Amino acid sequence: GKGRGYYIDYVLNQSGIRQWSLKKLADYGYDPHTGIWAECPGYSGVVMNDYANFTSLFDRNLHCDLTKELPVLPKAVAATPQYLFPNRMICGFGDTHPNYLNTTPVVRMIENAQVNGKEEQEKYFTALLKCLDPDAGKAAAKKNVRVSINSFFDDKPLTLKPDIRAGKIEDYVSPLFYAPNVSWLVQRNGMHPRHSLMISLNASEGNHMHANGISMELYGKGYVLGPDAGIGLYLYSGLDYAEYYSQFPSHNTVCVDGISSYPVMQSNHSFDLLSCFPASSAAAAAKDKFPSVTYSDVYFREPESRADQTRMMSIVTTGPETGYYVDIFRSRKERGGDKMHDYFYHNLGQEMTLAAADGTDLHLQPTEELAFAGAHLGAYSYLFDKKCARTGKDVKAVFTIRMPDKDDIRMNMWMKGEKDRTVFSALSPMTEGLSRTPGMPYNIKEQPTLTFVARQKGEAWNRPFVAVYEPSTVKETEQISSVTFPEVESKQPGSHVGICVKQKNGRTDYILSSDGATHPCLMGNGMKASATYALWGNRQGENCTLFLGNGTLLQTPSASVKADVPVNVLLEKEADGWYYTASGTCTVTLGGKTYKIKKGVTKKTKL
């Protein structure tokens, strides 16, 4: 034989055309900065499991620490909680069936640390394992497990150090996390299964991806209420996968001219991250790590229709158990000639209502308008029970999950009306991605998916899709009393949006957004901003939140934030005064006083 060293070297370092070494494959698939593997979450977990098992085999049988050769592995295992929604299930983008996180890779990192005397690594991953699986280590200790000395693959029972306490799940996730190699961005305001909010945004970069543009999943009240649709009943060989589940209309996205599409599976269509707050970061334990406002602004080129699209999304936290989402989607063809832009939103549940935002009836009529007739995608013909109304009014849709305990869950959506707009209520094929998920409140396979569509005739850039979403339940009622969309004045032509969110506790949030961060925009209430996103929160006449997102000016009748170059600044009023975080130098005027912030501060700091 050639000796152990030869074979270790071959597996680790030697590659052929179709047989890659462990190193080459890891270099190809893992992002060394984020630890994320270049496939959808479902498949990424499988690869992580295999690599972690290799680590164990190398430790036990070859007495070689694989993590020294592949330092990305511990980082990759530590990054896996970033996939989690607050209900502890993974995101559903691409060909994924969401479920709980597989903890085997975490176990392997503990074993690797124990074998190689790495105390910090053992501490970190033991705390993580006890966090994800409170019973970990207990079962193995009780059983009298016989360990065969003959088997190459036998495990010894795992022994966890009793003095290492379970970590907190909040310490293993970030408020904003961006993984460019899968074009995926997540925002979250905490990890409370019932009360926290989370957005998962993705385009199509890497393997096992769909044609979905800038797609989103939205979380609320224990469930991913706005889910990704999944793969389909017949997996990759099925027509339902090829025509519907892998295509734009099954996702929460915007489809242009009825034709938006591109290659699925191994795809190379990512979005660009234009700006965000807070900055994307690896998870770390920190006080006050979840700010009351997060946002991201991403750009996507839709290749089939040659369209430019941006999506600005935000989580606004209004209390320990309350908050809402903001979604501003701009879309237009590069060369004009736009026929239509279709905004799709799918939600769990069994009932949907669609009315004008003031409560009046839209008189929805049955229609066959959403169909592949007209050389559109075949996916359109998968929608059924379609009803529509042509209206320029603001609308409100309510999606209801009838719960066994009668505490029904609702997603409330308000959308700005526009000229040449048609709104639809419809049913789509069932949400196959969640059909295997344990603990769902109804039979997912038997329930078509509630679907809202807004069709904008012509361009949807200067008339963007502007929506506010708030999850609620029968017992935890919605906190928003009204959402209106005030007119915005600007001397610069472009896409300028105003939103006013009134809440039952007396708080009112005013929001301004522009496609030009340097364009001064004015709302009738005296709010002025030059920003991608600006928010002024006012409770019973008192300022409580000021946020400037990628901007140089936010001005209200009693406060202002100014900067020479675009910055992100968050100001929050607390019992003992104002606190701030800022990405760069700026000047703040509050209560008649002026404060000069001389450098960026990422930790919440007293003004």
Q: Model-derived features: where do they sit?
A:
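Short, hydrophobic/aromatic-enriched beta-strand segments in well-ordered soluble domains
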Residues: 343-345, 411-418, 422-440, 463-474
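Short glycine/proline-enriched turns and hinge-like loops at secondary-structure junctions
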Residues: 209-212, 322-323, 337, 392, ...
